[in-house]
Swiss-Prot record:
<keyword id="KW-0479">Metal-binding</keyword>
<keyword id="KW-1133">Transmembrane helix</keyword>
<comment type="subunit">
    <text>The cytochrome bc1 complex contains 11 subunits: 3 respiratory subunits (MT-CYB, CYC1 and UQCRFS1), 2 core proteins (UQCRC1 and UQCRC2) and 6 low-molecular weight proteins (UQCRH/QCR6, UQCRB/QCR7, UQCRQ/QCR8, UQCR10/QCR9, UQCR11/QCR10 and a cleavage product of UQCRFS1). This cytochrome bc1 complex then forms a dimer.</text>
</comment>
<keyword id="KW-0408">Iron</keyword>
<dbReference type="InterPro" id="IPR048259">
    <property type="entry name" value="Cytochrome_b_N_euk/bac"/>
</dbReference>
<dbReference type="InterPro" id="IPR005797">
    <property type="entry name" value="Cyt_b/b6_N"/>
</dbReference>
<keyword id="KW-0999">Mitochondrion inner membrane</keyword>
<dbReference type="Pfam" id="PF00032">
    <property type="entry name" value="Cytochrom_B_C"/>
</dbReference>
<keyword id="KW-0679">Respiratory chain</keyword>
<comment type="similarity">
    <text>Belongs to the cytochrome b family.</text>
</comment>
<feature type="binding site" description="axial binding residue">
    <location>
        <position position="97"/>
    </location>
    <ligand>
        <name>heme b b566</name>
    </ligand>
</feature>
<dbReference type="InterPro" id="IPR036150">
    <property type="entry name" value="Cyt_b/b6_C_sf"/>
</dbReference>
<comment type="function">
    <text>Component of the ubiquinol-cytochrome c reductase complex (complex III or cytochrome b-c1 complex) that is part of the mitochondrial respiratory chain. The b-c1 complex mediates electron transfer from ubiquinol to cytochrome c. Contributes to the generation of a proton gradient across the mitochondrial membrane that is then used for ATP synthesis.</text>
</comment>
<dbReference type="GO" id="GO:0045275">
    <property type="term" value="C:respiratory chain complex III"/>
</dbReference>
<feature type="transmembrane region" description="Helical">
    <location>
        <begin position="77"/>
        <end position="98"/>
    </location>
</feature>
<dbReference type="InterPro" id="IPR027387">
    <property type="entry name" value="Cytb/b6-like_sf"/>
</dbReference>
<keyword id="KW-0349">Heme</keyword>
């Protein structure tokens, strides 16, 4: 059996990726999120496939088909809420995974990091299109507002929006194509995850010290398979608690009202995991400026390898940079809160200040602090 594991062309790939993979002996629980994201992706694909078997992508029946899934399909409510809350878990883990990368300097693996940022964009696009599918009020108006942002693109904007809509407003054509894209994108994400892992296994994993760990590596199995399984059980426990006790905790009550183009909800807002970007978008009074800030708020992650000025890779031994990172985390939490608030004083001001702070910390304060720490260490 051992020989087959090491010699069979297909099993050999799995062996080198998950069994005999040399792994640093000191990686902490922060390195669990990669496997948890993989588990989330599998859950989303399975539950999504089961939902797609009962869902109809038509404006007249979409809302009713979701109701039918919850009421008449065996454990349909469980599948639907597992899919909706699974998306929330996905984003929680994504943000933790990115945060870990920033803290421990994992972005110095440039190829792995950049494919990860592209993955983030793809997952965000998939989640946005999935939110449109139940065809509730927030689905419809969210789709209208977010797709309309593309009209800010000079010259081709308005044509591009109509092209995406498949008409002169968000309608049947829009819903059908969003369903098609929402169905196919997770498989593209899976392929991209494989590329992400391919690049990662070229360099090997980073570790909390940020030092080269070639002299101290252990096999992935059984040490980290057990660790990943314990993380997975903890995740499933949390997810099931959320689904069974408060499935609508992270959702919007407006989405239980069927889409009505003639009636605008008082506060149009996306799901909680997009609120920080939505707050940055709203904090700029100019439409094009807002769209650029929105895109750049995530695209800025690609600049991290270039903005790394420290002689040390990880933040483990850099207390000043640690303080800045936690201020950045608090800024993002403030932005998330602001994104869910109405557009009025004092929320507008807080949002603008938090947005400025977000960009300043990443572009100016973090590199400057790194240089200062180098000086303090006489490097």
């Amino acid at each position: 059996m051992t020989n087959l594991r090491k010699s069979h062309p297909l099993i050999k790939i799995i062996n080198h990726s998950f069994i005999d993979l040399p792994t640093p002996s000191n990686i902490s629980a922060w390195w669990n999120f990669g496997s948890l994201l993989g588990a989330c992706l599998i859950i989303q694909i399975i539950t999504g496939l089961l939902l797609a078997m009962h869902y109809t992508a038509d404006t007249t029946t979409a809302f009713s088909s979701v109701t039918h899934i919850c009421r008449d399909v065996n454990y349909g409510w469980l599948i639907r809420y597992a899919h909706a809350n699974g998306a929330s878990m996905f984003f929680i883990f994504l943000y933790f995974h990115i945060g870990r990368g920033v803290y421990y300097g994992s972005y110095t693996f440039t190829e792995t990091w950049n494919i990860g940022v592209i993955l983030l964009f793809t997952v965000m696009a998939t989640a946005f299109m999935g939110y449109v599918l139940p065809w509730g009020q927030m689905s419809f108006w969210g789709a209208t507002v977010i797709t309309n942002l593309l009209s800010a693109i000079p010259y081709i904007g308005p044509t591009l929006v109509e092209w995406i809509w498949g008409g002169f407003s968000v309608d049947k054509a829009t819903l059908t194509r969003f369903f098609a894209f929402h169905f196919v994108l997770p498989f593209i994400i899976t392929a991209m995850v494989m590329i992400h892992l391919l690049f990662l296994h070229e360099t090997g994993s980073n570790n909390p010290s940020g030092l080269n760990s070639n002299s101290d590596k252990i096999p992935f199995h059984p040490y980290y398979t057990i660790k990943d399984i314990s993380g997975l059980l903890f995740m499933l426990m949390t997810l099931m608690t959320l689904i069974l006790f408060s499935p609508d905790l992270l959702g919007d009550p407006d989405n239980y009202t069927p889409a009505n183009p003639l009636n605008t909800p008082p506060h149009i807002k996306p799901e909680w995991y997009f609120l920080f970007a939505y707050a940055i978008l709203r904090s700029i009074p100019n439409k094009l400026g807002g769209v650029l800030a929105l895109v750049f708020s995530i695209l800025i992650l690609m600049l991290f390898p270039m903005l790394h000025m420290s002689k040390q890779r990880s933040m483990t031994f850099r207390p000043l940079s640690q303080c800045l990172l936690w201020i950045l985390v608090s800024t993002l939490i403030i932005l998330t809160w602001i994104g869910g608030q109405p557009v009025e004083y004092p929320f507008i001001k807080i949002g603008q200040l938090a947005s400025i702070f977000y960009f300043c910390i990443i572009l100016i304060l973090m590199p400057t602090t790194s240089l200062m720490e180098n000086k303090l260490l006489k490097w």
